[in-house]
């Protein structure tokens, strides 16, 4: 562990916008340490003193609720369209604990995940026909994951409406946080909030019958820390937060397709493992390991902010009350101090790992305990979706691309993905 404190004195907001996923490594170099260094870096960001952290010690600080809070840490320009106002992501203390437990009951428990599995398998199996005329992995899996999620939640929409809202959720992720497209992101956020609030209102009034014990039924009964029913907009936002993150897994599905092209030895291995299990798309260990490695190596969220609630320190670096803490997500997932051959794509590292969430520095969807920390409660569902998509992409009739355009993506564009969506075709 290092006790050195590095710093850069210049404002870094513009650098974050321009550098994207390269921001953290560039800041470290400006501060006089190596890009791979685990040394905390002090810097001004959006006019506020900020400490950039990574690795095991950074994770321990960032998710320590006795020292850190989320409320007020993320700029509204990012938080508003992405998460929605009043969502669990910005709550702390008892309010967060109560809300998070209700969401985890819906998405994290094994019986809820089991309800989701046949739905996503059915939707992904249907992609073979859609891919016959040519399509791309990103758009097609966003629709498949969206349909499976809405059906799982008990939302009574027809296929056309499911596709419409899955598309808007997907587009929101492509447009938020950037000046040129922020208006589109806000338009989608407003439309989504209105539609989901109406859905909650209709369930509460009896105009729509939610299936018994469904996610929709429980979200219509969502309460705050005082036991009071939350307003319909907030309940609708949390219903989105149980479905939209799974649509976002399409980004990882596109990256998985590029990884399969670049590591073709895994295609036959995954195909054979699925065949040995009767041709299933679900729970194929090799595909799960491949999916986890995709989530570790490929970029999704670059950094996350929090705020210190007390004077504290990390690795000898003082962190004062009110200062921002910025956790380097990608840098932690690929931290050379935590991972053997950290920069190498190797799904083998996850073979036989029963609980990847127990790995402190594996945080593609947040860290710490799912019920008390800020780890996404839908992580098991996300891994189910991605691993099933990996098996689908390994089917003999599926033709993956060889064009370099399908394998490249921007490291400075947030949120990034292969620009083509990764073109795919099926011969069946």
Range-by-range predicted roles:
Residues 1-7, 32-53, 57-60, 64-428:
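Cytochrome P450
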């Amino acid at each position: 562990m290092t006790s050195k404190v590095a710093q850069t004195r210049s404002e870094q907001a513009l650098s974050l916008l321009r550098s994207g996923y390269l921001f953290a490594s560039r800041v470290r170099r400006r501060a006089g340490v190596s890009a791979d260094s685990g040394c905390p870096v002090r810097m001004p960001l959006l006019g506020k003193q900020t400490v950039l952290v990574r690795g095991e010690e950074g994770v321990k600080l960032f998710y320590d609720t006795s020292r850190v809070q989320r409320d007020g840490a993320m700029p509204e320009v990012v938080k508003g369209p992405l998460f929605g106002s009043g969502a669990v992501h910005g709550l702390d203390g008892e309010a967060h604990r109560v809300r998070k437990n209700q969401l985890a009951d819906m998405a994290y428990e094994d019986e809820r995940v089991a309800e989701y599995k046949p739905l996503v398998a059915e939707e992904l199996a249907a992609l073979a026909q859609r891919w016959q005329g040519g399509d791309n992995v990103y758009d097609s899996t966003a629709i498949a994951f969206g349909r499976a999620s809405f059906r799982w939640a008990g939302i009574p929409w027809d296929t056309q409406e499911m596709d419409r809202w899955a598309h808007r959720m997907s587009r929101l992720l492509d447009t938020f946080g950037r000046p040129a497209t922020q208006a589109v992101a806000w338009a989608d956020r407003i439309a989504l909030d209105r539609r989901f609030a109406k859905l909650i209102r209709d369930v509460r009034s009896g105009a729509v019958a939610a299936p018994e014990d469904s996610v929709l039924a429980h979200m219509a009964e969502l309460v705050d820390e005082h036991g009071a029913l939350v307003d319909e907009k907030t309940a609708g936002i949390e219903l989105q937060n149980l479905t939209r993150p799974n649509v976002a897994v399409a980004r990882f599905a596109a990256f998985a397709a590029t990884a399969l092209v670049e590591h073709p030895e895994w295609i036959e291995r995954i195909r054979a493992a699925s065949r040995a299990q009767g041709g299933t798309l679900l729970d194929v260990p090799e595909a799960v390991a491949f999916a986890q490695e995709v989530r570790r190596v490929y970029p999704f969220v670059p950094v996350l902010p929090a705020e210190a609630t007390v004077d504290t320190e990390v690795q000898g670096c003082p962190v004062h009350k009110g200062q921002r803490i910025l956790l380097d997500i990608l840098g932690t997932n690929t931290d050379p101090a935590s991972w053997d051959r950290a920069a190498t794509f190797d799904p083998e590292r996850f073979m036989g790992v029963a609980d990847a969430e127990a790995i402190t520095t594996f945080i593609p969807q947040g860290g710490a305990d799912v019920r008390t920390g800020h780890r996404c409660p839908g992580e098991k569902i996300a891994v189910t979706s991605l691993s099933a998509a990996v098996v689908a992409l390994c089917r003999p009739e599926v033709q993956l691309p060889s064009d370099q355009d399908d394998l490249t993506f921007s490291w400075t564009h947030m949120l990034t993905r292969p620009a083509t969506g990764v073109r795919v075709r099926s011969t069946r």
